[in-house]
Each structure stands twice: as structure tokens, then as C-alpha cells.
Regions:
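HotDog/MaoC-like acyl-thioester-processing domains
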Residues: 11, 65-152, 202-208, 214-234
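Hot-dog-fold acyl-thioester-processing enzymes
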Residues: 1-63, 116-194
Length: 234
């Protein structure tokens, strides 16, 4: 699991308030995991837009881990949550984004995500100098690893088809990270201790996806290849 570095007291940090809407909650009115993932994407986009940096690169999520604060109230319908985000570290061709969810001045959950920049052709590239100009101080020269591990799918895993929908795909032509979290939300419901989603390969339009699962783990499998893996603790 990723390390959750504390909120930086130097360099750039960005905060924005969001209202939890009807499409973000389950039948109990609690924030769904995919709703939380969308907020993480939104505040990352809003932060990057606010910097004013002009770039043709597109950042995609490689891995996201959410940790939920014991004893805190779970966000629910119409709550106003404040998301504070900053760069927690960098690697050669990736960066870590840390984000805190605060509800009424109380921390409810934390997230750490590895993002990878892609050029207009869709290929990974090194982190640009313009990125370090903005986020270098908050990263504090902390190096983060881009390596990800993969546990094999056990033979006794439960398997079910996960049909892809037109609405699952984003401007890159891949299944969006938040759509993947929708599948996770079908099998894992809050509250829980922590959950981590790792993208080993992108899910494409022609893929026929099988969800394999055991307690504590989920795999998105295409033709015997794991493209996304999930770990969680309730």
C-alpha cells in the first residue's frame, strides 16, 4: 500500500469544495467508491487547470489507494466536502498526488495516487520541467516508485462477466478510472478500512472482461491477462 505523506507546509497545495450529489451515493445515501474516485479526478483536473501550465500531455492514473479514517463520519448525500491535493513525490515518468477529504473540518478519508503523463500519441513520457516548476517544492525531492505488484488469480475465485458500456470510455478511448471503480463498488461497499486499484494495462473497447474475486481482492481479466487488480480490507 502507498505511504500517506502528511499535508505539505511548503510549496503548492490546492483546495476545492464539492457537494456530494445524487449520482455519487448508494441507496443508503453514502458516498460510493466510484463517486470518491470521480472527486479525486475532478480536484486533480481543477488543480492542474489552476496552474495555467500549457501542455499537450495527458495524465492517467496508474494506482489509487484510499484509506478511511477510523471513527470519522462517512460522507453522504448533500454533504459539502473539502478536497485538498498536492504532489507527494515524483519518479522519472510518474508523480504521486496526495488528496485529503475533509468533512466539517474533520478528516474522513485520504488518497494517494500514482499518475503517469502520456504524450499526444498515448506513450508515457518523462515528467516535464514545467511540472517541477509548479510542484517541485511540495514534492520535496521525495522519490516514489512506479512499480506495481500483481497477485495471481486463484483457481477458486468467483468469476462473472463485466460488459463494457459506451459511457465507460473517456477521451483517450480507454475505460475511465472512475468506471472501473463502479465495478469495485458492486462488490465492495463502504464503510471499509482501505482499498487500492492498480491499472496494469488499459481496458479497451473490444475487451471482454471477466471479474474474478475472492474476499479482499478483485481482478479484471481479459483473455487470461489481468488488466486491473484490486485489494481491500473491510
Amino acid at each position: 500500500m502507498l505511504e500517506f505523506v502528511p499535508l505539505t507546509d511548503q510549496g503548492r497545495r490546492f483546495a476545492e469544495q464539492y457537494i456530494i450529489r445524487l449520482g455519487d451515493v448508494d441507496m443508503r445515501g453514502l458516498l460510493r467508491l466510484d463517486g470518491a474516485a470521480r472527486f479525486l479526478q475532478d480536484v486533480a483536473t481543477d488543480d492542474w487547470s489552476d496552474t495555467g501550465v500549457i501542455s499537450d500531455d495527458t495524465w492517467v492514473v496508474r494506482r489509487t489507494t484510499m484509506r478511511f479514517i477510523e471513527g470519522a463520519r462517512w460522507p453522504r448525500y448533500l454533504d459539502r466536502v473539502t478536497l485538498t491535493t498536492w504532489c507527494g513525490g515524483v519518479g522519472a515518468a510518474w508523480a504521486e498526488r496526495r488528496t485529503n477529504f475533509d468533512l466539517g473540518g474533520e478528516r474522513s478519508l485520504e488518497a494517494a495516487a500514482i499518475w503517469v503523463p502520456l504524450n499526444p500519441s498515448g506513450h508515457p513520457v518523462r515528467v516535464r520541467e514545467s511540472f517541477f516548476d509548479v510542484y517541485g517544492e511540495s514534492a520535496r525531492a521525495r522519490k516514489v516508485s512506479g512499480r506495481v505488484s500483481l497477485t495471481p488469480v486463484p483457481d477458486d475465485a468467483t468469476r462473472a462477466a463485466w460488459p463494457l458500456r459506451h459511457a465507460d470510455f473517456d477521451i483517450l478511448g480507454h475505460v475511465n478510472n472512475a468506471a472501473v471503480w463502479q465495478a469495485v463498488a458492486e462488490l465492495v461497499t463502504p464503510p471499509l478500512e482501505w482499498v487500492s486499484v492498480t491499472h496494469h494495462q488499459s481496458l479497451e473497447r473490444e475487451d471482454e472482461v471477466t471479474l474474478a474475486s475472492v474476499p479482499g481482492a478483485i481482478w479484471f481479466v481479459v483473455d487470461g491477462v489481468v488488466k486491473v487488480s484490486v485489494e481491500y480490507v473491510l
